Amino acid sequence: MTTPIKRDKPWLMRTYSGHSSAKASNELYRTNLSKGQTGLSVAFDLPTQTGYDADHPLARGEVGKVGVPICNIGDMEALFDQIPLGQMNTSMTINATAAWLLSLYVAVAERQGATPAQLQGTTQNDILKEYLSRGTYIFPPQPSVRLITDIIAYTVKNIPKWNPTNICSYHLQEAGATPTQELAYALSTAIAILDAVRDSGQIGAEGFEQVVGRISFFVNAGIRFIEETCKMRAFGEMWDKLTQERYGARSEEMRRFRYGVQVNSLGLTEAQPENNVQRIVLEMLGITLSKKARARALQLPAWNEALGLPRPWDQQWALRMQQVLAFETDLLEYGDIFDGSPVIAAKVKALVDGATAEMARVQEQGGMVQAIESGYVKRQLVTSHTERMRAIERGDLKIIGLNCFQETEESPLTGGKDSGILKVDPRAEREQIERLNVFRAKRNSAEVKAALANLAETARGGANIMPASILCAHAGVTTGEWAQTLRDIFGEYRAPTGIDIPANDDSRGAKAVAIRAEVTKTGEELGRPLRLLIGKPGLDGHSNGAEQIAVKGRDVGFEIVYEGIRLTPEQIAKAALEEGVHLIGLSVLSGSHVEMVEDVFNQLDQVGLKHLPVVIGGIIPESDARLLKEKGISAVYTPKDIDMNGIMVDILNLIRKDHDLQPVAVA
């Protein structure tokens, strides 16, 4: 009889999901759990993430698009119907409104009969990185740090199995961070948060080691999987040293670097999307091969996320990738296969040294909060991302199917009637608003008023925000009401854009110089310099593309008007009129491009700029691209369009066409 081989326990397996409505998302969750998924990872829509109810004007077109809409406890109960929260491990990707969504989760668990002490899961709750990448911040940095701190202090005392914050290097990589910058900025964020918890006085010295032990990280894993393995080993080394030396953590268990992963979604391509399958598998190796640095939880994107929302079958495929690696291979039968490798050791040391030096530069500015407020970190990320995009454009950084090996057969994966993606029913927004109105009509308005008054008093007075928020959840307060109460007290914030960086070397190349000459010449023909407005309408905060267009446009001679994210169509039209721009470039990655274009055109018409050429970039299916052009969009750009010089020539010629000038060709 053969002795069974001893195998390590697999990581927690999740798929990041949520769309349309709480009911539809609940059905998806229960289906995924039946297929062997071992935890939930909830995606919320943008209004929920930024603190708006579904009927707010800024929520138009965004409801249910990139996640599930949660306006109140009724939605939260529907989301977890037949899912016992006392037995589930739930990760919630939520930041600015994390205190609110956790309060709703606790309230629903209590209604199910569970106690807070039974709950297991994670709130992302890293608002600092929102100022640098995803853009779903609401309040200024200092009040945001206070909210993060309150959640940590509350959960350590009351929900001891909860991970109150996921310090995110994931989004930093997608915003352009190198591995060294990922390490430095994530650990600098952890320092800022742990220092704030300690300074708040909510946790005594005797309990602070428990705080350290509950800090977790959410990490990206890119295609260079050997380097990614080294990055994770460097994270572990640096965290162990930091928690011992700065925070006096003695327990090895409390110092353990605890992290979950989603592999690189923005590295997936629209061109030849079938190649994304092997990309995802290789990226998974970077955070599973090394036992000492293995992820504790993993969620894989679907192969088609560069095209749009994945279907249930696509999410099943992503889950099966994890299961094959964990249960069919011999990965979990061995110790750390990288121990003793001089190559790995040297790479880890180089990453540690580089990250330590960058952390020192952050601390010289007063810490991570101050380095964000000054724009320093954002400029570093925009610079790194610009260098990466230029390397792809030149062909130095090869992306199969995008800038090399572009010959291809037609893919059967995208040949069906649905073009290989899930499309949210346009009725979802209207139906969510109807449910919200019914909920408001049935609740006790006096209880709501009292709960909001208590919340406001708590926010002003400095007490922990969680108990008051849980009372709000039970009273029937809505997401928009909770957030607006805090907006009235803390104010709102606009983060630095980071585009004020030195010109890239490519801006001095022959093609860029030739484009700049034509831009200057056209400006002289029209009597003033050419001016572009780059606009981010709606609630989508993914600004990488807009920033790169702004930087490139500036480098080839255009004057750039870019005021950052979350603009209303009215603000865009007003800025176009006041700034006298020649063309508007819109960026929308949330799937709400049709609604946003309609609203922007309506506003341009009202200010007398109906003639103004407008282009758009984003994750836009071909069928939608045709529709947008029918509505008047001059050009549509998607992630496969990497020739930035070519885009600049397109823009120049659209301006010339608008003024009855002949197009120019730039060699």
Annotated model-derived regions:
Residues 311-312, 316, 320-323, 327-514, ...:
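Flexible, glycine-rich loop/tail regions that form catalytic "lids" or insertion modules at the edges
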Residues 652-666:
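The C-terminal output helix
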